[in-house]
A protein has these predicted regions:
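HhH-family (HhH-GPD) DNA N-glycosylase catalytic core used in base-excision repair
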Residues: 1-259
Length: 259
């Protein structure tokens, strides 16, 4: 499948959107960005107001790409609503066209469990290793790609296999969470229609056996809600976001470092 999207009058920057740390499987190959989305290879190239799309699947149509890249979000209205001082104005100008990516809930959850206390290069390497060891093989244009493994596949994997992928202590968390998702103790697909507060409570629930989703704290939960479950009121705060807010908006924090 090959087609173009006309993005005239639509603020969009492909590189800003794919390289900001919200998604980890995209790689630049010459002038194209390439990744596996769900069960298909997708190649994207932006040329001014045109977005070129090549995919291994005939079901990769304009609707699929628009949904994944959230092209239909009213970005100008959103930016106007937050452009209230010079700090935000500078950020908006520097990252013009950056959009959220609508990811698969399971892949998003697993990816951000891997992302804890790791830089982006390390996260990408871990996820690439997991896909190579456990994902389904796809051949496209003479190149081999791998899907992100379903929760059931990771749940049946040996812990040492995940450790060998570079996960370290995260292997235990990912394995246990994959088991909970595979056994349907938490059904991620059902959370998209629920309210933010309810979803957050579910993702962070503690049971008599410990956390229902090991490895999921407030930041991971907010990432999953924002990037895959349509919770646009979620606001993930990692150490870098916290430092930035404390620098420019210190009045938003009290003396409790957990807020």
């Amino acid at each position: 499948m090959e087609f173009q999207l006309n993005l005239s009058d639509i603020p969009f920057n492909l590189e800003n959107s794919l390289e900001c740390g919200q998604v980890f499987r995209w790689k630049r190959e010459n002038s194209w960005w390439v990744a596996v989305i769900d069960d298909r290879v997708v190649k994207l190239k932006q040329e001014d107001n045109l977005l070129n799309v090549i995919s291994s699947s005939d079901s990769t149509n304009e609707e699929f790409i628009r949904k994944y890249l959230r092209i239909n979000d009213p970005l100008p209205d959103i930016l106007t609503s937050i452009n209230r001082d010079h700090v935000m104005a500078t950020a908006i100008h520097k990252l013009i066209g950056l959009r959220l990516i609508k990811q698969s809930p399971w892949e998003c959850l697993a990816s951000f469990i891997c992302a804890t206390y790791k830089n982006i290069i390390g996260i990408k390497n871990m996820i690439s290793n997991i896909c190579f060891r456990l994902g389904q093989r796809i051949e496209f244009e003479g190149i081999i790609y791998y899907t992100f493994p379903e929760a059931e596949i990771i749940a049946s994997a040996d812990r040492h296999t995940l450790e060998d992928c570079g996960l370290g202590y995260r292997a235990k968390f990912l394995l246990e969470t994959a088991n909970r998702i595979a056994s349907r103790e938490v059904i991620l697909e059902n959370l998209e229609s629920a309210k933010y507060e309810n979803v957050r409570e579910i993702l962070l629930e503690n049971t008599d056996k410990g956390k229902i989703l090991p490895g999921v704290g407030p930041k991971v939960a907010d990432c999953v809600m924002l990037f895959s479950l349509e919770k646009l009121d979620a606001f993930p705060i990692d150490v870098w976001i916290r430092r930035t807010i404390q620098k420019y908006y210190p009045f938003l924090f009290d003396n409790d470092s957990n807020h």
